């Protein structure tokens, strides 16, 4: 299986650089994983596709303003992108500058804050905040929303709201769980009123989600690691849902990866899970938990299009993407969505 198998040509004008005026105003392409049948819908039509008793699982991570700008002691400019918060004072981060800062050197951030370069681990740096404030307080004060590289514009005030789900709760992500961006409070209320059950897991999406796959053979790819939490109450709800013959619908690839990570950690029998996961899902993977998923359109050759292909069949997914391009769907984080049902193995 070659990475290039997952390639497609995307016209630049189909990359969504801004969100729709209303969250749920996006289009929705439905894909039946068993038959490959496609249908063009609106996102609000999803209400008619989720049944009473089905369980929808959302990722409630909160995107932190993870991009910082500052200067080295020499005066050279640098940019810091937080990969994860280690504690209240320390971060693991990518640092972009003409020359890498030295260990033990001081970095002067915008706003007058200072950080010490504590250690280096290959491409990542450990930085320590020299302040009475917490990392989160400094990020909220001077950090910028970490828009993906393909959005290709500076972040704006509106992104602080729109590059964030309405149900976000646990700060720590440096990229949004984008399938969730389409839901507003009214739609969540309508789902609950219909008898759909709602549950939340947490996966702090890392910057690694944008890293290209740099090997030719898919099997040689080393997945980045992210922190996930699947609490016991969600495990219990999933068991009840399955026992009643209803579906588990994951909102986004991060929810899929959280649930499947928990199943993998307990060898197929779902138990509560909290810790790092580097689960890499590609065609051939047997899904343990998830029956249907909502997801945006992903980058060519990305691990995310591989995951969707594993779920609904490679040929079906690549055909769906060609259809989406022909029909001018909007792609990537601020783009349109798919509702995909699982292909039976």
Swiss-Prot record:
Main location (coarse class): cytoplasm
Enzyme Commission number: 2.4.99.17
Key word Transcription regulation present: no
Recorded metabolic or biological pathway in which this protein acts: tRNA modification; tRNA-queuosine biosynthesis
GO cellular component: cytoplasm
Pfam families: Queuosine_synth (PF02547)
Chemical reaction(s) catalysed: 7-aminomethyl-7-carbaguanosine(34) in tRNA + S-adenosyl-L-methionine = epoxyqueuosine(34) in tRNA + adenine + L-methionine + 2 H(+)
Entry's localization field: Cytoplasm
InterPro entries: QueA, QueA_dom1, QueA_dom2, QueA_sf
Family in the record: Belongs to the QueA family.
HAMAP family, per the entry: QueA (MF_00113)
PANTHER family named in the record: S-ADENOSYLMETHIONINE:TRNA RIBOSYLTRANSFERASE-ISOMERASE
Protein name: S-adenosylmethionine:tRNA ribosyltransferase-isomerase
Native source organism of the sequence: Shewanella sp. (strain ANA-3)
Classification lineage: Bacteria, Pseudomonadati, Pseudomonadota, Gammaproteobacteria, Alteromonadales
Gene designation: queA
